[in-house]
Every structure is written in C-alpha cells, then in structure tokens.
Amino acid sequence: MAPAPPPAASFTSAEVQRRLAAGACWVRRGASLYDLTGFVRHHPGGEQLLLARAGQDISADLDGPPHKHSDNARRWLEQYYVGELRADPQDPTENGAGAPAETQKTDAAIEPQFKVVDWDKDLVDWQKPLLWQVGHLGEKYDEWVHQPVARPIRLFHSDLIEAFSKTVWYSVPIIWVPLVLYLSWSYYRTLTQDNIRLFASFTRDYSLVVPESVFIGLFVLGMLIWTLVEYLIHRFLFHMKPPSNSHYLIMLHFVMHGQHHKAPFDGSRLVFPPVPASVVVAFFYVFLRLILPEAVAGILFAGGLLGYVLYDMTHYYLHFGSPHKGSYLYNMKAHHVKHHFEYQKSGFGISTKLWDYFFHTLIPEEADPKMQ
C-alpha cells in the first residue's frame, strides 16, 4: 500500500500578509495558496496586473473577463501551489474561517483535473536526462509535450553535449552581428565594382547589372525572406506531429522544438545554441551562393542573418521581458504565450504576424465582454 501523501502546508492570513510585505506575490484560489513571485515578470498580462492581485482570490480572474485562462494555464498555476489558508484563532475577524465563505468552495468538476503536479508520477523521470525517455512515450508524447512545466530540462547524459545544447541569450548578437557587419561591408564593396550581373549564366545579352544603390533593398529583402523562413520552419518543421511508433523522430522533434514547448521558461533553451546554429547558417549561405551571384547572395544572406538575430532576441524578450501595456511587443507577447498554452496549431509568427495573416493562421481574438 502506497504511503499517504504528506499533509499540505497551511498559513494564516497574518503569515501571508508578512510574506506580501516582504515583497512576495502570493495569490489564492479559494483556500489554496500560490507563490507567484518567480513568475511575475513572465506573466503575459504584465507585472502590474499580477502584483495588483497579490493576496487576493484570483478565481474570477481565471475565468475572465478580460481573458479566460486555458487548461494549460491552470495546470501551470498548480506548480506554484504552497499550501492552504487556515483560520487564525487569535484573529476574531476570521470567525474560524480560513477564507471568505464565497471563495471556500471550488468547482468539484475542475478541481481533480488541475491538482498539484506530482513529479514522481509523471511519464518521465525528471531526475534523468529526458531525450532518450521521450522516444518511449509513443502516442502519449504529443499531449505530454504540450503541457508546459515551470522547470529546466536536461537532455543528455554527457556534460559536454549538454553544454552545446543550450546557451545564454547574449551569445546570439555577440557571435552573429559581427558577421553581419563584415559580410555587409565586404559585399557592398564588391557591388561598387559594377561587374555584378543577374542571369549572366543564362544570357549575357539580357543580363542585368546590379548597381550599389540596390544594397539596402537587397538587405531588407533578406530580412523579409527570413520572416517567411521563420514562419515556415516553425509551422511545418517544429510543429510536425512525429509518428507515435517512431522513437527517433519523437526524439528529433523534442530536440528541435518539443523541449521548448515543455519548458517555455527555461532561459538556457530559448535561443539557438551557436554550434547547431552554425550548421544551419552555413546551409543557407551555401544554398544562396549556388543560385545567385556571390554579392547578391551575400547581401541577402546578411539581411536574413540579421533577421534571425532579431527573431531570437524578440523570442527571448517575449518570454522574459515585461513590455509596456498596449505596445507592439506587449501584444506579441500575449500572442506568443497563447500559442504556447492554448493555440499550438496557430500563431506561428514570432517577430511578426505578417505570415499568420497571409496564411490564415492567426490566433482567434477573444470577444470583448463589453460588446456582448
């Protein structure tokens, strides 16, 4: 017979208030208490919205308006559960109740579904590297990988390989921006020689001279092309559903993108690590060189590479930044968090929604309750 689980911790209102006064952000749902201090700056609605509810019951906020929280958001909340609110016998104002009467009861149909996360009973052993384990999940993999958790991930047994699989955010601009500057300067100088022609490999008579004045246009075109590549890779490669009977394709999916959906706030896995990124960058450079004149290919590539850097920086900020309410990045953050927690089959644009508009994969807007 399995041992009974340990009793939940309990706190009086006075104990909760002391923690709030010390700067913590605790909230409650009925009598259940949650410490969201570490999540405040990640909240898609902004820090202030969450801080304003410190010490309060958030049951109504979970159901909206303005936003009805998804099942995954409610599961996410349970990872921050710390205990129950209990009556303080020395405080006569509580009248023997640990929480106001209207918040004592919770929906019995919902409660079991979003119980406290039990890491010991998960489908994988979180004390061991995950990569080899996920391949054995089979049909359970897709549902499991789209139920995010608030903890870091380890993929490999080897410390060396593990180190190559993650990185800090600032490695991206440090490594790639100097290359963008060098390529831009080098290929601009090549354009100034006035001997670059398009279609010269097919016909000299109808080939087009590429003047230096088109440098900016080619560079911006490269950035625009990157936004399309970003969208296509995210939608069709990262969000492919691997066959449930393919151990290795499941592992490949988890390495490419599944790990990010499982642990969306693992800061060491939010941007593309330099070693695997170098392989992909080299592929795109060689591909462009094969189909275009060297200078044209190089300028397009430099623009695309800068587009990639901006994409990775934007992606990191959407997870860890706290943009001003109403700003472009605020709306993009809300859009991207919905992609993680509720709409995994839409909202594939990270740096822009342009291609979501074009291919009709926008995340549906929630109806304004004031208009109903």
UniProtKB/Swiss-Prot annotation:
Protein known as: Fatty acid 2-hydroxylase
Extract the Pfam families matched here.
Answer: Cyt-b5 (PF00173), FA_hydroxylase (PF04116)
Q: Which residues form the Cytochrome b5 heme-binding domain?
A: 8-86
Q: How does it sit in the membrane?
A: Multi-pass membrane protein
Per the record, the pathway is: Lipid metabolism; fatty acid metabolism; Sphingolipid metabolism; galactosylceramide biosynthesis
Residues noted as binding Zn(2+) 1 in the record, renumbered to the chain: H234, H239, H257, H261, H339
List each copy of the Fatty acid hydroxylase domain by range: 219-361
Tissues where the protein occurs: Detected in oligodendrocytes (at protein level). Detected in sciatic nerve.
Q: Which family does the record assign?
A: Belongs to the sterol desaturase family. SCS7 subfamily.
- State where heme binds: H43, H69
Q: Its encoding gene is what?
A: Fa2h
Keyword annotations for this protein?
Endoplasmic reticulum, Fatty acid biosynthesis, Fatty acid metabolism, Heme, Iron, Lipid biosynthesis, Lipid metabolism, Membrane, Metal-binding, Microsome, Oxidoreductase, Sphingolipid metabolism, Transmembrane, Transmembrane helix, Zinc
Cellular component GO terms, alphabetically?
Answer: endoplasmic reticulum; endoplasmic reticulum membrane; membrane
Q: State how the cofactor is bound.
A: Binds 2 Zn(2+) ions per subunit that likely form a catalytic dimetal center.
Q: What is known of its domains?
A: The histidine box domains may contain the active site and/or be involved in metal ion binding.
- Which EC numbers does the record give? 1.14.18.-
Name a GO molecular-function annotation.
fatty acid 2-hydroxylase activity
